[in-house]
Amino acid sequence: MLCLCLYVPIAGAAQTEFQYFESKGLPAELKSIFKLSVFIPSQEFSTYRQWKQKIVQAGDKDLDGQLDFEEFVHYLQDHEKKLRLVFKSLDKKNDGRIDAQEIMQSLRDLGVKISEQQAEKILKSMDKNGTMTIDWNEWRDYHLLHPVENIPEIILYWKHSTIFDVGENLTVPDEFTVEERQTGMWWRHLVAGGGAGAVSRTCTAPLDRLKVLMQVHASRSNNMCIVGGFTQMIREGGAKSLWRGNGINVLKIAPESAIKFMAYEQMKRLVGSDQETLRIHERLVAGSLAGAIAQSSIYPMEVLKTRMALRKTGQYSGMLDCARRILAKEGVAAFYKGYIPNMLGIIPYAGIDLAVYETLKNTWLQRYAVNSADPGVFVLLACGTISSTCGQLASYPLALVRTRMQAQASIEGAPEVTMSSLFKQILRTEGAFGLYRGLAPNFMKVIPAVSISYVVYENLKITLGVQSR
């Protein structure tokens, strides 16, 4: 009689326990599928436990924390189908074998460059007969009990702009795999990212409003500090005033994300790449164009956000009242004040953010991605924080000028100024330091914003039925 005993330790058990299978009376082909070594080197046990947890999560249909025979067989069948599709996608020559060059090409398509020596190292980990190529059987045997479905898992694990929301809107959109696009998982990722952004922006809204106040009102004669800025806001409008401008800031997430995603998919076709995923410079071009289209579409909301953040108690009854008064007093053109420096800021922010993130990602993958492309929470948070900080630092002077231009009519007696004249005025009266007013609260919000958006994103993914990382 066909039977299989699967022992799964209780999660969090203190003692070191090994998972093992016992097969009795099984056909030879099933034995080859079910076999798993009992003796695991201690240094590999941490990775092994991660595999075990992922396998249980992937196959546990009744959510009892362990796999029964039927669940495990279903997991194997489903996983083998996916592995077959991946093998075919990697087999560029269609000869039934994968060599080092094909591995290098597949990773290059994802924007990850590795040497031939590194590709051969990957091959050796799977190559049983020493031919320096991998056939289907070797591929299947190596990956069947490893819940790593494909090399594009790098895309899955290393999503950037979808996961991390630091309040900026200039990042290059993330890539989505063919499977994610075909199954509709892409919109669930976007919804999870939008929800995470809403929570993150709301939690860091006081720092964001302080940044806007310092950008517009701080000067040599009015040296506004962080504590003084918070005190001034609370004294003028109470604690509730710390969240002025947050409503419109959250509201614009949905239309901007949707427009940027659709524009990015169209721009990818225009750049002329026939690959499933774009190379880095192609992503920068397509992402920057998509960002420009999205920003142009929702830019009036950016102006409203700045005006709402700067408003005094009782000045406007709400967003619609603010928009109506701007239209009546200043005309339609007022909704596009600061548009040029905003567009110019896309390239330095998106370019540096993407370049730094990809550099950090590639460095980690080349040095530490032995068994999985999963970097873990802290590596991902560190990479997101560093890349966002570098991008903001490069584009901050343009962001400051944009904000001052957006706020012009809200400052009594402020003359109309152009971008170039405003740059000259700031440099003449405040020096280069004046271009970085408000940078401190802006940097202070990066780490909490990244951390909060990541946690909320992961929880929303579970709610929306997106496969856990």
Swiss-Prot record:
GO cellular component: mitochondrial inner membrane; mitochondrion
Membrane topology term: Multi-pass membrane protein
Mitochondrial matrix side: 208-244, 302-337, 399-437
Signal peptide stretch: none
Region (C-terminal transmembrane transporter domain): 166-469
Catalysed reactions, as listed in the record: Mg(2+)(out) + phosphate(in) + ATP(out) = Mg(2+)(in) + phosphate(out) + ATP(in)
Solcar repeat segments: 184-270, 278-363, 375-463
Activity regulation annotation text: Activated by an increase in cytosolic calcium levels that induce a conformational change of the N-terminal regulatory domain, uncapping the channel and allowing transport.
InterPro entries tied to this protein: EF-hand-dom_pair, EF_hand_dom, GDC-like, Mit_carrier, Mitochondrial_sb/sol_carrier, Mt_carrier_dom_sf
Phenotype of the disrupted gene, per the record: Homozygous knockout mice lacking Slc25a25 are viable, born at the expected Mendelian ratio and fertile. They display resistance to diet-induced obesity and reduced physical endurance. Cellular metabolism is characterized by reduction in total mitochondrial and non-mitochondrial respiration, which leads to reduction in available ATP.
PROSITE patterns: EF_HAND_2, SOLCAR
Binding site for Ca(2+): 60, 62, 64, 66, 71
Chain intervals for the UniProt region annotation (Linker region): 151-160
SMART domains found in the cross-reference section: EFh
Biological processes annotated in GO: adipose tissue development; ATP metabolic process; calcium ion transmembrane transport; camera-type eye development; cellular respiration; multicellular organism growth; response to activity; response to dietary excess
MF (Gene Ontology): ATP:phosphate antiporter activity; calcium ion binding
Keywords, in A-Z order: Antiport, Calcium, Membrane, Metal-binding, Mitochondrion, Mitochondrion inner membrane, Repeat, Transmembrane, Transmembrane helix, Transport
Topological domains, Mitochondrial intermembrane: 1-189, 265-287, 358-380, 458-469
Location of the protein in the cell: Mitochondrion inner membrane
Family: Belongs to the mitochondrial carrier (TC 2.A.29) family.
Main function: Electroneutral antiporter that most probably mediates the transport of adenyl nucleotides through the inner mitochondrial membrane. Originally identified as an ATP-magnesium/inorganic phosphate antiporter, it could have a broader specificity for adenyl nucleotides. By regulating the mitochondrial matrix adenyl nucleotide pool could adapt to changing cellular energetic demands and indirectly regulate adenyl nucleotide-dependent metabolic pathways.
Name listed for the protein in its UniProt record: Mitochondrial adenyl nucleotide antiporter SLC25A25
Species whose genome carries this gene: Mus musculus
Record gene name: Slc25a25
